UniProtKB/Swiss-Prot annotation:
Keyword Plastid set for record: no
Quaternary organization: Part of the 30S ribosomal subunit. Forms a tight complex with proteins S10 and S14.
Family classification: Belongs to the universal ribosomal protein uS3 family.
Pfam families recorded: KH_2 (PF07650), Ribosomal_S3_C (PF00189)
Name the UniProt record assigns to this protein: Small ribosomal subunit protein uS3
Residue segments, region Disordered: 212-234
Lineage of the species this protein comes from: Bacteria, Bacillati, Bacillota, Clostridia, Peptostreptococcales
SUPFAM superfamilies registered for this protein in UniProt: Prokaryotic type KH domain (KH-domain type II), Ribosomal protein S3 C-terminal domain
Amino acid sequence: MGQKVNPHGLRVGVIKDWDAKWYANKRDFSDYLIEDHSIRKFVKKKLFLSGINKIETERAANNRVKINVHTAKPGMVIGKGGIGVEELRKELEKMTKKTVIVNVVEVKRPEVESQLVAENIAFSLERRVSFRRAMKQAMQRAMRAGAKGIKVSTAGRLGGADMARTEGYSEGNVPLHTLRADIDYGFAEADTTYGKLGIKVWIYKGEILPTKGKNEETNNETADNSRGRRREAK
């Protein structure tokens, strides 16, 4: 199962959180969902060269929308004196007709963020770089940056071949079945003269284990419950 499903969706609620942090009743849910999709599409298109890793949305009861933009190049998003982020905020307010707050979050290690790695490979393929070279260079950079494992797959008319095929490489360990494993997944498309190429990237960053404090609380609760059961038995 871990080989087939989206690794992020499989781990949401276990070790990963939702990108949309809001609650809505049945009447408003569909409108908010469509609005979220429009916001993500608009921001991704406008700031594509800024290396957007992910976009998180939060909604408050007073018709306010907070957008967290995770980017590898925060300077390009903010602009000189904050002009860029202010312009983006005004455009989003005009589109949504709501009060919008834009928060820019810097991505410290873009080499181990799968979405940015996939987009970087796609950009290289559009510049006619050999697909094998582009994939292997991206894998080497990720492993040097501290990734525990990486898997890359490219599909389409590779090298201009008449028949489409899929080719992939992996390095290190990528345990897709382990739910506590922090697997980052990204997908991008490259528009070449021979047609579209699809790039998928899986990056293993290590295991996310429960904190020591939580373990102690759980152990204390278990001990209290067992003592209570003993008293009842007496």
